Amino acid sequence: MADQYEKRITWTIKNFSSLQSHAIYFDIFVVGDTKWHLLAYPKGYGDSINKCLSLFLGVPDPDDLPSGWKRHIIYRLTVVNQMSEKLSKQEVARGGFYPRSLTFGSQVMLPLTELYGGFLVSGQVKIVAEVGVLEVVGKSDVLEETLLVNGGINVNGFQVLPSQVESVNNLFKNHPDIASNFRLENTHLRTTYLNSLLCLTELLCQSPHKLSNVDLANAHCTLTCVTKAGFKLDWLEKKLKEVGKTRMQQLEQNLKDLKESLCWSSDDEDDLSRSVKT
């Protein structure tokens, strides 16, 4: 499998400053055939207590996996700077998960002294996790079990959750030949690629000004991945280019406005300097 992030999770922690819990968890999610969760320590963990926000990615139910299991993954954890994307804190790494190694992440993800530098806005801290599975040892049937428990439904040859039926039906209605070249027969792989496609279409339905450069870069990677799998996505590629162009125009306008603001400030200082001299 190529080094691609298969799933992107956004976790908004509300009322961060008033949290009393030592540790907080994000809802369990599935990537590949494995359940994962995010674990955060708002006041730090280990040597970082009262110093840093600690953040980890972990396997919550190792007993559900077969004997000898192992998962080799690539992941990126980001604490988003909501004022300036470039100042966001990231942990990018590969990790080998197995029974005696169930978590990866960082004890020093974000110094607490930096919270008010754009990371804590309106009482909220925003975390983004991106995960891709590179190698699987000991297959799990968690995805098939999840579909069974939730009443998996066959839509155009893909097993989907009831909550996804409308979106998938609309996708095939608007683009009837979208899967005409899709040849994978494995149920898990078919569902994984379709989920990636649904996430991509949902992302590109957002207003361009809400999308970061990281969002667009990940969208390009996902589009390449699902296209190689056999989906016909010329229309989506066009949409992504349009969104990228709009985003670029917005950035250029923001830069222009900033330059004009700086020029006005400089003129005001010159006027003040002249008035003081007179």
UniProtKB/Swiss-Prot annotation:
Residues 6-131 form the MATH domain. Gene3D superfamilies: Apoptosis, Tumor Necrosis Factor Receptor Associated Protein 2, Chain A. SMART domains: MATH. Keywords: Coiled coil. PROSITE patterns: MATH. InterPro entries: MATH-CC_domain_protein, MATH/TRAF_dom, TRAF-like. It comes from the Eukaryota. Residues 232-267 form a coiled coil. It holds the Pfam family MATH_2. This is MATH domain and coiled-coil domain-containing protein At1g31400.
